[in-house]
Regions:
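N-terminal subdomain of nucleotide-sugar transferases
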Residues: 2-44
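Conserved nucleotide-sugar phosphate-binding/catalytic loop shared by glycosyltransferases and other
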Residues: 14-16, 22, 40-88
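Surface-exposed amphipathic alpha-helices with a cationic face
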Residues: 33, 110-114, 141
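An aromatic- and histidine-rich active-site surface loop
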Residues: 49-51, 97-114
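Short N-terminal targeting/anchoring amphipathic segment
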Residues: 84-104, 124
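Active-site-proximal region of nucleotide-activated glycan assembly enzymes
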Residues: 117-178
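Conserved small/polar residues in nucleotide/adenosyl-binding loops
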Residues: 179-186
Length: 186
């Protein structure tokens, strides 16, 4: 019989580009550690993910941009950071890549890792392909193995694709279950 200390360490590359991604990533990391104690997390994340053991390559705030104008104004810096991250992850040779939200940043990283290292890739939070840029699903098929969705209806957007889709739910729904309101009679 082998102990958990004898098992291979799994190196997970995980990247969140904004606060909401950090809030999704930390519980995921906690769950993964509880089920497999020999995990090393590398990538980019915020304080919650770092507290779960992430070795963050750079501060998440470096890539946290919103809207249309802010990314354009920071495009050169964002591309340089993404290139540096790709090099770091290639050298680290992770067993799997998990991109959390931020699809315009994470999907090119997943594509690079899929082509270079041929590792499994996961996108946690589906891009809004059900609303716009529906053609993106076809390009995602080339580099994303699994999408974890927050809403059950999102799975339909992938019905004609080879991407495995898993509905995991929205964390707000779970937190609402913790706080039940009193009945009107109380």
């Amino acid at each position: 019989m082998t102990s958990s200390n004898d098992k291979k360490t799994i190196k997970i590359a995980i990247v969140a580009g904004e606060k909401s991604g950090d809030e999704l990533g930390a519980p995921l990391m906690h769950f993964l550690k509880a089920n497999h104690p020999n995990i090393e997390f590398i990538g980019v994340g915020g304080p919650r993910m770092i507290s779960e053991g992430l070795n963050s390559f750079f501060e998440m705030s470096e890539i946290s941009v919103m809207g249309i104008i802010e990314p354009l104004l920071n495009l050169r810096r964002l591309l340089k950071l993404r290139k540096s991250l790709k090099g770091f992850l290639e050298r680290e040779n992770p067993d799997i890549f998990i991109g959390i939200d931020s699809p315009d940043f994470n999907i090119p990283v997943a594509k690079f890792l899929k082509n270079k290292l041929d590792i499994p890739t996961v996108q946690y939070v589906s891009p809004s392909v059900w609303a716009w840029r529906k053609g993106r699903v076809k390009s995602m098929e080339k580099c994303i193995d699994q999408v974890l969705t927050l809403f059950p209806f999102e799975k339909r957007a992938y019905s004609d694709s080879t991407i495995d889709v898993c509905y995991v739910g929205h964390p707000l729904a779970y937190s609402c279950l913790l706080y039940t309101s009193p009945s009107p009679r109380d």
